[in-house]
Regions:
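Extended, well-ordered protein cores
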Residues: 16-280, 289-513, 517, 521-577
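N-terminal amphipathic/basic-hydrophobic helices that include classical n-h-c signal peptides
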Residues: 1-14
Length: 577
């Protein structure tokens, strides 16, 4: 016979434990002072606090235990939390953690090695099977390796009322805007992910395979054996590398002609396969004369533009003085010829092309909008800026905010309303789950996505250098997302706007699902609309200046962008959401 009392006690025991994560940098430092305070409150209540290490160094050690002594080995806490996250009793406090770029990953490896941990070097260009295996393990650690594992649910985020009221009484600084501002967003008009996207709703459960079929008839399986669920939305898209480089070259010239700073805004951390390549493209194009002139030497030094100018500077430091000086002189000549670069640190000469993880779009664009639409130049002064965001999918959001501020001036934290967010995040939805399905092709041909019966679900033509990307969005998270939006709209009596573009293949399929699943709920008296991201931005801004609130109901990327953009403008930071 079941002892329901004992079962109940076991459940309560499990639910009275909180997992507190150990991460990196500032959050790790804060933990030393904050965690004892948390424990002082939870212990009398019978709530246990358990720490788990998901820091970059911790994840490296956990994945390379075969290189360590028994005393150095640690548990794979991220894998443990990934299993725990699907359990109903899970209570996990996930602090911000590093989404490491290659330079950050390499620095962490060197630091561990210096402390006596014999972890292997990161082989950027593996030459053996063992090096290929090591690189693959490290590639799972770099970028946003934590969030896709832990984010099993959708997102419902807003600034607490107390934080909003504090910002109104103690407003943060907002730079003045000029109607004559030359700041603007530049995106591709052809050859980007947006323009090439195809989308399919899977009619029945199956397994899929991604295959490259070369123009010469050769084939290469890029991924196979992965599952698809009934009703799942899958997409494929291609970024043309040749058109991307043409775009960069044109925008560099345009920034020079307009006398504005040149900047690029990507997410090389979360989009750890595609965006470092996009970043490397602009680094190469800006310093093209240098990379072309020293191509053989740079190849010998393993200098990859994807790692930024900082990697170049570091690797030429050991060259003979005359050779190093010649390269530095050529770099200086490029600076003088090309438009001035937006800076990460003007005093130290660190540009926004130095490190791929230094300028991250969801933080960098709101910061610039808050600062009169300007960034800092090499002279340490603010200046109007060209914001290069290659893909069109979401760049219109930022251009709309810029246009609005040019016309109406800076937003006022004292009077402005709020834009909260309900985000489609669960089970690695959309682009943020695409890492293992993103490939840079080495030749011309087509990339096919086929089901287990051999039917072609999607097909994309590619050229050498192009980036192919496939995304998945499961149906259950979409249904939950719609329910969350309806519940939030009713609880707050606030308009809920689905930010979906009917002219984009993926969004067109999602619009059909949203319209279908809204019928499962009582929406009487609610204001629920579907708008393109640019139109939804304009609508939200028109309300925000009147002190009115709006709910943005978005996909995974815009969840990330909006939960930085609006909080930074409203309360000065996204850390208080």
């Amino acid at each position: 016979m079941f002892n329901f009392v004992d079962i109940g006690r076991q459940i309560l025991s499990k639910m009275s434990k909180i997992i507190y994560t150990i991460t990196d940098e500032a959050p790790a430092l804060a933990t030393y002072s904050f965690l004892p305070i948390v424990e002082a409150f939870t212990k009398p209540a019978g709530v246990e606090i358990e720490t788990r290490d998901i820091s970059l160094s911790g994840r490296i050690l956990a994945n390379f235990s075969e290189f360590l002594t028994d005393e150095q080995k640690i548990s794979d806490d991220l894998a443990y939390l990934g299993k725990l996250a699907v359990e109903p009793e899970a209570n996990i406090i996930k602090l911000p953690n590093i989404s490491a770029s290659i330079p950050q990953l390499v620095a962490a490896i060197k630091e561990l090695q210096a402390k006596g941990y014999a972890v292997p070097d990161y082989p950027e260009e593996p030459k053996t099977g063992e090096e290929t295996f090591i690189k693959a393990k490290y590639d799972k650690i770099k970028g946003s390796a934590v969030n896709p594992v832990l984010r099993e649910g959708n997102s419902d985020r807003r600034a607490p009322k107390a934080v909003k009221e504090y910002a109104r009484k103690h407003p943060h600084s907002m730079g003045a805007w000029s109607a004559d501002s030359k700041s603007h967003v530049s995106s591709m008009t052809d050859g980007d992910f947006y323009g090439s996207e195809k989308s399919v709703v899977v009619p029945k459960a199956t397994k899929y395979k991604i295959t490259f079929v070369g123009a010469d008839g050769s084939t290469k399986v890029l991924k196979e054996g992965a599952s698809l669920l009934e009703g799942e939305t899958i997409d494929s898209a291609v970024m043309s590398y040749s058109k991307l480089n043409d775009f960069y070259a044109k925008e560099i010239e345009d920034a020079k002609a307009k006398d504005v700073l040149f900047s690029v805004h990507l997410k090389a951390t979360m989009m750890k396969v595609s965006d470092p390549i996009l970043f490397g493209g602009v680094v190469y194009q800006y310093f093209k004369e240098v990379y072309d002139k020293y191509a053989t030497l740079f190849d010998e030094l393993n200098i990859n533009p994807n790692n930024g100018l900082g990697d170049l500077e570091k690797k030429i430091a050991s060259l003979p003085e005359d050779q190093k000086a010649a390269i530095e002189a050529d770099i200086k000549a490029v600076y003088e010829k090309n438009p001035a670069l937006a800076m990460v640190n003007s005093d130290k000469g660190i540009t926004n092309l130095h490190v791929p993880s230094d300028v991250i779009i969801d933080a960098s664009m709101p910061a610039a909008i808050r600062t009169s639409g300007q960034m800092w130049g090499p002279d340490g002064k603010q200046k109007d800026t060209k914001f290069v965001i290659p893909d069109r999918c979401y760049s219109g959001v930022y251009q709309t905010v810029i246009d609005f501020c040019k016309k109406n001036g800076a937003l006022d934290p004292v009077t402005m309303g709020s834009v909260s967010n309900v985000g489609l995040m669960a089970q690695a939805a959309e682009e943020y789950g695409s890492h293992d399905k993103t490939f840079q092709l080495t030749g011309a041909g087509t990339v096919q996505v086929t089901d287990e019966e051999g039917n072609v679900l999607m097909e994309q033509a590619v050229e050498a250098g192009d980036i192919f990307r496939m995304c998945q969005t499961k149906d259950a998270p979409v249904q939950d997302w719609v329910k969350l939006a309806v519940n939030r709209a009713r609880a707050t009596n606030t308009p809920a706007i689905f930010w979906l573009d009917k002219n984009r293949a993926h969004d067109a399929n999602l619009i059909q699902k949203v319209e279908k699943y809204l019928k499962d709920h009582d929406t009487t008296g609610l204001d629920i609309q579907i708008m393109s991201p640019a139109d939804a931005t304009q609508y939200s801004l028109e309300r925000i200046v009147k002190g009115l609130d709006t709910i943005s109901v978005t996909g995974n990327v815009l969840r990330d962008y909006n939960t930085d953009l609006f909080p930074i403008l409203e309360v000065g930071t996204s850390a208080k959401m």
